């Protein structure tokens, strides 16, 4: 087996596949080393689920392809592997406070608001269903909500490299009224997969900026008709057609980066250890995996480095033999619920749609992001608690459950955060010809998750191409803020700059 390549890419998720594809397009021979059994990372497919002789594709969880995922969609479209996407129609907020349960449509209202960003949230207050969920405390503390939204407009943590150390979104939430606190609590869990108390304020502000506050249509997104696994497998096929190589179940333990020569990656595969060599290495694994490789390879130089936390969560799918009353395809639970978001798969995926058309059944996917004591429950206990809460919302489905399915996802989902300046690895690292890519990597792009993985994968590939004297790839530009949001942002940043200047002059 040839163990010398033009570049070694550690990790076969979206970042690694992106880097490998762009290198292979320029005639280089990359080797992608993936520890798992399939490519794709958190977008990978999993073993199919069999229910009453019907076969359903499985994956890490439903992923939205957001309107701002411009580089990810451009890459797939350029290689003719972007499927016909299914536009999201509505996201519902389901709020429980004690025995009181209310629902309000929020997704379409935000993205189709008549008011410009950042005033588009005001449209929600014209909905009777939304108003019914609020109480007096929400109205009294409404300006605390507005001040947080203004903060998100006036501070761009990723571009400014502003970690806002020690501050969490949970602290901001304490000043809000209960219903609005629960709404953003739910949005935080839905988008960032953890408790607001654990979400760094910098990460939350950047999240708001990218997904909603600067543009109304930033909240628009689509679904993949057959899940993410299909896309990842097609990316892998394209890479191999262009001359790249992918090895599965190949875990990199450490690397030896040498100056001016080949670097070496030491791999464990089927219980055996081997080494491969290349002049360039791109570390494109998830954050916990990257931390392990870096600290094992460079123990002295890496003691002060910061790596964002990886988060675990549970995915529960429930099949029913009837369809519930009219409801949107997705939404969030907040307040006194154990689960945090939901997707009706028979309204999204082709295989589930076909099953629904032939049987009249339905299937929902719900996610549970914590807290830790909830995730520590046994499968039976967790399922019991989820069903108890679920039947509060859909009592008409009680007695119609066909089969449940519980999936525990490992702690690899990135909690967006910025380390103190100088401690958070970017695409270029202190080690020559060792580059990083992934949604955990420090970079000025405003993007998150799949899009950030894709953008940093392209940039890491560009570093290799630049060193080889080959043409680089241009990143696609993100939609600008709407005019009013842009004006407020410029005014606030100008004010911050003037205040800093006055402090320095004293």
Where are these regions (language model features)?
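Mobile amphipathic helical/loop "lid" adjacent to a hydrophobic cofactor/ligand pocket
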Residues: 73, 77-78, 82-199
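Active-site-proximal substrate-binding core of FAD-dependent oxidoreductases
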Residues: 463-506
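Short beta-strand to alpha-helix junction loop
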Residues: 63-70, 159-165, 171, 176, ...
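N-terminal Rossmann-like FAD-binding beta1-loop-alpha1 element of flavoenzymes
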Residues: 3-32
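Mid-domain catalytic core of redox enzymes
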Residues: 26, 248-365, 369-375, 380, ...
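FAD-binding beta-loop-beta segment adjacent to the flavin cofactor pocket
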Residues: 351-358, 410-436, 440-445
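Helical element adjacent to the flavin cofactor pocket in flavoenzyme catalytic cores
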Residues: 207-272, 280
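Glycine-rich FAD pyrophosphate-binding loop
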Residues: 24-49
